[in-house]
């Protein structure tokens, strides 16, 4: 933020070094990653100094963190969890405290320590459970670089911060720099962080909370709890606003004329033409989000989680995604970025219908329904101009080809 003084920057750097050292010492002591640690506090508590002082920002230093940067200096406290958290202290006590010589007594002692595993202070999520681009995990509370028990809202706010910082860089440049290389590098770093936070939001869709905690008093309590329909729907709404809608990337407009990297050899083919490749970069980011939302693992999970509480059906999920990609300019002028996005989405739906695809018959049926619905909308729409009309005809042609192929 603009309020970061030299003193605050030094504080941030010191805390990051403290985090790095504590994290690696934790590994030396046998601690694995705990990617549920950062979900310890509520979003509002991240700016409360008394809570930070007593509990920390995370229950574990073994997570991967993003810095907590407030919009104002008055609300800025710690930036990162830089010392062992409550989970770490508990796990280390279990492994290193002095035990009893009697094996039966020692077993009971360790069982007593482990019995507090279900309290929030001791929440744990390992690498293989983490929800990320690979879709290896499906609990949205177990993610890398997320923050708070409301990660979608933290990430939404972080994306808004990135927009402001990016626009400020475009207006003022990098102080003391005559070359645009540093501006180029910083804008790219911000752009990558924007995507990371969008993926954290996307993890809510089809998300299922789970726990392996052993509960003696209630062995039949649910181990899988789907994310509420409201939260999943809101996640798509946030993605619509920040990634899919027309103008979602307008915050970058002023930076495009300055995005010229220094020439450093000839090995990187990406820089051969020197231009900032606006449409390619933005489509690439949108593709990553669609990779997450339309992955066969995720879509099948949405279907299966309906058997244990998920009320956000596959048809509703795909309909909301279709609305996010088509509704805003159905009868309005359409820009190149939205053209690319709409074509990309239709191609993905087409691939879902292929006979040898990874998608189940249930998912293929839902994709088929979406294609019919989109084609109906496009045919009814009054194109804003000839360019929009040609684009819509191209989409209709692609849908018709895919449908006729299935027949």
Task: Indicate residue ranges for each PLM-predicted region.
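Active-site recognition of the HExxH zinc-binding catalytic motif
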Residues: 19-34
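Active-site and adjacent substrate-binding regions of carbohydrate-active enzymes
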Residues: 13, 31-32, 40-41
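Short pre-active-site segment immediately N-terminal to the catalytic Zn-binding motif
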Residues: 2-21
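Conserved catalytic/binding loops enriched for acidic/polar residues
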Residues: 8, 37-407
């Amino acid at each position: 933020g603009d309020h970061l003084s030299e003193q605050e920057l030094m504080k941030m750097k010191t805390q990051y070094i403290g985090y790095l050292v504590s994290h690696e010492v934790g590994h030396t002591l046998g601690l694995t990653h705990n990617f549920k640690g950062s979900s310890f506090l509520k979003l509002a508590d991240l700016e409360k100094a008394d809570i930070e002082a007593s509990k920390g920002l995370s229950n574990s230093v073994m997570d991967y963190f993003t810095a907590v940067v407030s919009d104002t200096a008055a609300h800025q406290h710690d930036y990162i969890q830089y010392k062992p958290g409550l989970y770490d202290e508990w796990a280390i006590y279990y492994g290193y405290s002095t035990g009893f010589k009697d094996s039966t007594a020692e077993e009971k002692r360790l069982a007593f320590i482990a019995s507090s595993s279900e309290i929030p202070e001791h929440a744990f999520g390992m690498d293989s459970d983490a929800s990320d681009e690979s879709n290896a995990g499906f609990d949205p509370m177990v993610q890398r670089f997320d923050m708070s028990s409301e990660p979608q809202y933290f990430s939404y706010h972080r994306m808004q911060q990135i927009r402001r910082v990016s626009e400020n860089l475009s207006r003022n440049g990098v102080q003391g720099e005559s070359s645009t290389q540093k501006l180029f590098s910083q804008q790219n770093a911000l752009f990558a962080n924007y995507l990371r936070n969008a993926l954290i939001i996307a993890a809510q869709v089809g998300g299922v909370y789970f726990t392996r905690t052993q509960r003696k008093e209630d062995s039949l309590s649910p181990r899988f709890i789907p994310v509420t329909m409201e939260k999943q729907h809101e996640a798509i709404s946030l993605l619509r606003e920040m990634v899919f809608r027309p103008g979602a990337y307008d915050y970058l407009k002023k930076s495009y004329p300055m995005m010229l990297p220094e020439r450093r050899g000839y090995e990187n083919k990406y820089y051969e033409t020197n231009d900032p490749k606006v449409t390619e970069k933005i489509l690439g980011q949108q593709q990553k989000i669609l990779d997450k939302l339309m992955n066969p693992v995720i879509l099948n999970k949405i279907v299966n989680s309906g058997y244990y509480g998920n009320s956000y059906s596959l048809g509703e999920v795909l309909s909301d995604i279709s609305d996010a990609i088509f509704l805003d300019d159905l009868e309005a002028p359409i820009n190149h970025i939205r053209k690319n996005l709409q074509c990309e989405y239709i191609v993905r739906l087409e691939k879902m219908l292929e006979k040898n695809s990874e998608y189940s018959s249930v998912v293929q049926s839902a994709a088929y329904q979406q294609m019919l619905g989109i084609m109906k909308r496009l045919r009814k729409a009054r194109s804003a101009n000839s360019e929009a009309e040609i684009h819509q005809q191209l989409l209709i042609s692609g849908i018709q080809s895919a449908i006729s192929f299935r027949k």
